[in-house]
């Protein structure tokens, strides 16, 4: 069962990315990605 997850920037809280996951997990996904508003690579966390 795959689910759609939305990633938001940890600094400015803008929702920049959406990813699909293979299975449901209890832990939040954290990935370092590029943020357009911050103009740099920042930590992005999964929103709920």
UniProtKB/Swiss-Prot annotation:
Gene3D superfamilies per record: Ribosomal protein L33 (2.20.28.120)
Coiled coil segments of this chain: none
UniProt record, GO biological process: translation
GO CC field: cytoplasm; ribonucleoprotein complex; ribosome
Matches recorded under SUPFAM superfamilies: Zn-binding ribosomal proteins
Disulfide bond positions: none
Source superkingdom: Bacteria
Keyword Glycosyltransferase among record annotations: no
InterPro entries, alphabetized: Ribosomal_bL33, Ribosomal_bL33_sf, Ribosomal_zn-bd
Alphabetically ordered keywords of this record: Ribonucleoprotein, Ribosomal protein
MF annotations from Gene Ontology: structural constituent of ribosome
Family: Belongs to the bacterial ribosomal protein bL33 family.
Annotated protein name in UniProt: Large ribosomal subunit protein bL33A
Upper classification of the organism: Bacteria, Bacillati, Bacillota, Bacilli, Bacillales
């Amino acid at each position: 069962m795959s689910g759609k997850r939305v990633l938001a920037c940890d600094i400015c809280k803008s929702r920049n990315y959406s990813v699909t996951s293979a299975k449901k997990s209890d832990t939040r996904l954290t990935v370092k990605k590029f943020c357009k508003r911050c103009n740099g690579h920042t930590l992005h966390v999964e929103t709920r």
